[in-house]
Amino acid sequence: MREVVELYKRIGGFQALHVAQAYEVLKEALGEADVRFFSFTGNLVATGLREIIAEALRERLFNVVVTTAGALDHDIAKAMGASYRPGSFDLDDYELAEKGLHRLGNVVISREEYGPYVEKFVLQRCERLWGRSLATYELAEEFGRDLPEDSILGAAARAGVKVFVPGIVDGAVGTALLTCNDLARVRRGGARLVVDVLKDEEALREIVHGGKRLAALIVGGGISKHHVIWWAQFKGGLDYVVYISTAVEYDGSLSGARPREAVSWGKVKPTAKSVYVYADATLVLPILLKALCGK
């Protein structure tokens, strides 16, 4: 893939140039930044990017992950054997609903192989979760121990990479944890699981304040993007940052905001090396991550 990056560099224009520049920023960050965040949204895990992300974590390109509940849902469902099939953006959604199928973009997922698979996985672990107070990164590690190394959570657990999920209740895993606590009231007289998100914040505070230089690859937007740049401001901002997104900035959304906007908030340093790649992540992330593996 490094040959592709070099080709993009020679093309020297438009988003090809931005991809080549993003590679250079991330390559330097691997050698200079001791804290390297990887932020991505859950929809990417519904694609084959899941295995590429897992490889990047096995290679320890990054040592902190911030993601969404959907990433856990798709990662677990796939590990449990759920079928994710290629489809079309133009499929009839009413017909899909009648057939018991979900559509995520142009990926089709069986309704019975999504939520139920995730719920079964979580509920099978209720016994060892009851009565404990866990941060989301600790829950992710607990789940990762039981998942294969080609999964994101499995790779992260084996590599010692913390996975933070600030919006963990916003998905099948969160609902399954609620069901887990409902079962605890019936079977154990109230020995519930407590998900302590402030414990996550304490850990992030230690990571950020303990780091010398901060880097981030941020794919997509939303809570996973903002949580990284929010914490970076308490260290003076990110030193290296690459955004990959197709969102626009002109509606004032966080998802479309460029790195330069984060400078005004103190979340990216004025001296930071930054690149914004306006592209579908499924097109450019494999190139960047594969080129970086082994560096």
From Swiss-Prot:
Enzyme Commission code: 2.5.1.46
Uppermost EC category: transferase
Cofactor requirement: NAD(+)
Gene Ontology MF terms in the entry: deoxyhypusine synthase activity
Disulfide topology: none
Catalytic residues as annotated in Swiss-Prot or TrEMBL: K267
PANTHER family given in the database record: DEOXYHYPUSINE SYNTHASE
Family: Belongs to the deoxyhypusine synthase family.
Name of the featured protein: Probable deoxyhypusine synthase
Organism: Pyrobaculum calidifontis (strain DSM 21063 / JCM 11548 / VA1)
Upper classification of the organism: Archaea, Thermoproteota, Thermoprotei, Thermoproteales, Thermoproteaceae
